[in-house]
A protein has these predicted regions:
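Gly/Gly-Pro- and Ser/Thr-rich, intrinsically disordered tail segments characteristic of DNA damage-repair
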Residues: 1-234, 240-242, 280, 389-447
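Residues at or immediately flanking beta-strands
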Residues: 143-145, 293, 368
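Short clusters of hydrophobic/aromatic residues that line enzyme substrate/ligand-binding pockets
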Residues: 169-172, 185, 251, 257, ...
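Short acidic-glycine loop/turn motifs at beta-strand connectors
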Residues: 31, 63-64, 298-300, 378
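DNA-contacting surface of Y-family translesion DNA polymerases
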Residues: 195-363, 447
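Short Gly/Ser/Thr- and Asp/Glu-enriched loop/turn motifs at secondary-structure junctions
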Residues: 99-103, 149-152, 287-291, 362-366
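Short, hydrophobic beta-strand segments
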Residues: 105-110, 330-337, 376, 381-387
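C-terminal hydrophobic structural anchor segments
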Residues: 345-347, 351-407
Length: 447
């Protein structure tokens, strides 16, 4: 049996931990730059407001029990509370595999090291789940749902059911046919939004239909990935050994600006800041980057002409159904003399080509950086014979800087290239709650 622990309305629950006055009130957490609602309390959902509704449409709205309450995304707080939940789970389970900021798979003591074990005593798992849920609530303050099943895919379904139960825990029965028959395919973990259309064309409407479909048909519709999901719906583990904490293939950082940028200095400051943040992630993973892609987005697509090489190809979140080019994104590629994790080396190399990204008169709304060609620190690579000796040695400078920023607060020590003071382009978080668990200057006051 494998369990899935998932924080209920996680962002809102984190806000309520630090401000109990929000309990029982309609609360929503906003996206970057206070754009739209990304997390909502049950009271907020009960008003019929859809997730993703823009903030400007709701900020002056009155409801019968008082005004709506909005909070800016407090990522520092959410990340710290997530870490605390994982610590509690590691106290109770022999194996813990974090899947996202608010979800983690757990293997209870009775099955750790024996993942093929069947359901066993369902009552034991039910009581164990209640105990784990109660401990997370008491120690961290976050309400959770817990689901147990033979596979990760079934555990996700069990968790979804458990969240709706008073006890917050559900153990999948040996034969989940009745449950799967009521579950649409678009609610199955990992199916996404596009595959259900293809599945319906093959008369596969529910999770039960997907489970019972022939392997060849499933593979033809969604490849090996969908076949694994179907196999897991049959109770046969396929994704048990996936490591969600494995080394990344790339590391990135990007933000939409609070105000549009019109100067090269401001554009360079934003890119230097995002480079520093991404480099910190690199060092945390113990990785070096061989190069990076730098890009920026203008407010008016196609407002000026650039060479084809300067256009940023659609990738990741920017790629449309047909691929191709996005005329609002422009960028360039930098290859470092040798793999590095040193922020100053990266910023210097990026700065040399920033002129190719900036055009006078353009208004920029976003910038970002993606490190690629990642290698483990200590791995063998071809060094640059002409590089200064100090570049080939592992510098302790950024180890010390990272340690200081952990101890004193994020961004306390930074490079001058990032600019001094809060820039106009910084992300808007006008309704930010206190970062009381990670910032000494924002500790809560007890009266």
């Amino acid at each position: 049996m494998i369990g899935l622990v998932d924080g209920n309305n996680f962002y809102v629950s984190c806000e309520r931990v630090m401000n109990p006055k929000l309990n029982g009130k309609p609360v929503a957490v906003l996206s970057n730059n206070d754009g739209c609602c990304v997390a909502m309390s049950p009271e907020f959902k009960a008003l019929g407001i859809a997730r993703g509704t823009p903030y400007y449409q709701l900020k002056d709205r009155e409801v019968p029990k008082g005004n709506l309450i909005f909070c800016s995304s407090n990522y520092e707080l959410y990340g710290d509370i997530s870490r605390r939940i994982i610590q509690v789970l590691r106290e109770r389970a022999v194996e813990v595999e974090q899947y996202s900021i608010d979800e983690a798979f757990i293997w209870p003591p009775s099955v750790a090291g024996n993942r093929e074990q069947g359901l066993g005593n369902r009552d034991w798992y039910l009581e164990y789940g209640k105990s784990v849920r109660a401990q997370v609530l008491q120690w961290v303050g976050i309400p959770c749902g817990v689901g147990f099943a033979k596979t990760k895919t079934l555990a996700k379904i069990a968790n979804h059911i458990g969240k709706k139960l008073p006890e917050g825990v559900f153990v999948m029965p040996d034969d989940p046919t009745d449950i799967l028959a009521k579950l649409p395919t678009d609610e199955v973990w990992g199916v996404g939004r596009r595959l259900p259309l293809k599945l319906r064309a093959e008369r596969i409407f529910t999770a039960k239909d997907l489970r019972d479909a022939p392997d060849d048909l499933v593979r033809s519709v969604g490849g090996v990935t969908l076949l694994r999901m179907a196999t897991e719906l049959r109770g046969v583990p396929c994704n048990q050994d996936r490591d969600y904490s494995a080394d990344p293939d790339s590391v990135s950082c990007s933000r939409s600006f609070g105000e549009q940028i019109t100067t090269m200095d401001a554009l360079m400051e934003s890119i230097a800041s995002f480079t520093a943040q991404a480099a910190t992630k690199l060092r945390r993973h113990g990785m070096l980057a061989t190069g990076c892609n730098v890009y920026a987005q203008v407010a008016v697509p196609g407002m000026f002409k650039v060479s084809p090489e300067q256009r940023e190809p659609r990738s990741g979140g920017y790629q449309g159904c047909g691929g191709g080019w996005d005329s609002s994104f422009y960028g360039y590629t930098v290859t470092f003399p040798e793999p590095t994790d040193a922020t100053n080396v990266m910023v210097r190399a990026i700065h040399e080509q920033i002129g190719s990204l900036f055009v006078k008169g353009a208004k920029y709304r976003k910038s970002g950086i993606v490190f690629f060609g990642l290698e483990k620190v200590g791995a063998a690579y071809q060094a640059d014979l002409f590089a200064p000796a100090e570049k080939r040695e592992k510098s302790k400078l950024y180890v010390a800087i990272d340690a200081l920023n952990v101890r004193l607060g994020k961004g306390k020590v930074f490079s001058a290239a990032e600019g001094v003071g809060k820039p106009a382009w910084a992300m808007k978080r006008s309704k930010l709650s206190k970062r009381a668990t990670t910032n000494w200057d924002e500790l809560l006051t007890v009266r």
